[in-house]
Amino acid sequence: PFCNAFTGC
């Protein structure tokens, strides 16, 4: 649902 180091975007 959002961008982060684990899922990307």
Swiss-Prot record:
Question: Which keywords accompany this UniProt record?
Answer: Amidation, Disulfide bond, Hormone, Neuropeptide, Secreted
- Entry comment describing in which tissues the protein is expressed: Stored in pericardial organs and released into the hemolymph.
- Organism, per UniProt? Carcinus maenas
Positions carrying Cysteine amide: 9
Any keyword Chaperone? Answer: no
Q: What is its main location?
A: secreted
Q: What is this protein called?
A: Cardioactive peptide
**Disulfide-bond pairs as recorded:** 3-9
